Design a protein with these regions (language model features):
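Functional transmembrane helices that form membrane-embedded active or gating regions
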Residues: 4-16, 78-79, 83, 203-216, ...
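Hydrophobic alpha-helical segments with transmembrane-like composition
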Residues: 57-58, 66-67, 95-105, 111-196
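Aromatic-anchored segments of alpha-helical transmembrane domains
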Residues: 17-24, 93-94, 160-173, 212-227, ...
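Functionally critical transmembrane alpha-helices in membrane proteins and complexes, commonly lining
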Residues: 6-67, 88-89, 93
Length: 337
């Protein structure tokens, strides 16, 4: 049990930091030919090697929920699982629709109205897009739970092999029924379960996953840079999608590395990791508030090698502190479950 706690705590921490990094570097991405090449390469490099962040959160969900051996209770599931995520999402979507109306020039109510009217189809703020494909996954989790308990492991392995094959087709723009967003995201659920429950935890296996992951990251960075230089503008194709083989391999690597090294953390580090993990969803939901002035007032002048870490710390610490304050009251802690 101790391994499980530390393992998932560490995963949530590294994923939260990586998500913030992706959002911090955003102003640099499209500056090819505007800022020095080394600065652009730094930002694009960080973007290329952190795309596993969001998929890792889905892997965690799959690993935990598919490992749950309790009988399925529909009422409990809707109230305690789905509702626990859906209701806060709706409230934060409304808040961020309001925030979207604020710019350095002032407040625009028309922008808020437009954002809210489009909210059934588009996120009200850039980081909330995650929930538009994460929440629907709750409708297929019971199916995967049944499969995990009742079918032979080879069925799961065959499913994952086919899913990864279709993600490869999608990466290379070979589209078909397999290009459906729900199909491409839901494979992360049984993958998380298999990585947690079925893959042996030994050095050779972790080395294998690490090798595949590092190659995937290197290829991703190379393709993004090459395509952008050829087009003379920032061009990523599908290499930075969350639904492609390269990102699946990178996310699997992070999962296995955290699983392998999680137990070796010093006690003082474990405490910090556990605290951050408890507030990882709060950090995810709240950090854009602290990035708002950076983006609106252009407070990112400087080399991204130091600007990105600085804003990760500032926005991450601010979001962590705010999440902690929310957790101190029963009236507010449900907003950041």
């Amino acid at each position: 049990m101790r391994e499980r706690v530390l393992f998932f705590d560490l995963l949530r921490c590294v994923a939260a930091v990586a998500v913030i990094a992706i959002h911090v570097l955003a102003p640099y991405r499209n500056e090819l030919g505007v800022i020095p090449m080394d600065q652009w390469l730094t930002a694009v490099g960080v973007n290329s090697v952190t795309r596993w962040a969001v998929p890792v959160f889905i892997l965690i969900t799959g690993a935990l929920m598919l490992s749950d051996a309790r009988p399925f209770d529909g009422k409990y599931y809707v109230k305690r699982r789905l509702g626990k995520v859906l209701v806060p999402f709706l409230i934060w979507s409304t808040f961020y629709a309001y925030l979207s109306g604020w710019t350095a020039q002032g407040f625009g109510f028309e922008t808020v109205k437009e954002v809210l009217s489009n909210s059934p189809f588009h996120a009200t703020y850039y980081h909330l897009g995650f929930f538009y494909y994460f929440i629907p996954l709750y409708f297929v989790i019971p199916l995967f739970q049944w499969m995990a308990r009742n079918v032979d492991d080879n069925v799961l392995y065959t499913y994952l092999a086919f899913w990864m094959f279709t993600s490869t087709l999608f990466l290379f723009k070979i589209d078909g029924p397999w290009s459906n967003q729900m199909w491409l995201y839901m494979g992360y659920l049984p993958l998380g379960y298999v990585l947690f429950q079925k893959v042996p935890l030994n050095r050779s296996m972790v080395t294998l996953f690490t090798g595949f992951g590092l190659v995937a990251l290197a290829v991703t960075f190379t393709m993004v840079v090459t395509n952008s230089l050829e087009a003379e503008k920032y061009t990523v194709g599908r290499w930075l999608s969350y639904k492609t083989l390269n990102v699946i391999l990178a996310a699997s690597m992070i999962f296995m590395l955290c699983r392998y090294f999680g137990e070796g953390l010093p006690k003082n580090v474990q405490k910090v990791v556990s605290f951050i993990s408890q507030h990882s969803l709060g950090i995810y939901l709240l950090h854009p508030i602290f990035l708002w002035p950076m983006k609106e007032f252009g407070w990112y002048t400087g080399h991204p090698a130091w600007v990105i870490p600085v804003w990760i710390v500032l926005s991450g610490a601010g979001a962590l502190a705010m999440s902690y304050l929310f957790s101190k009251s029963a009236k507010t802690r449900w907003l950041l479950p």
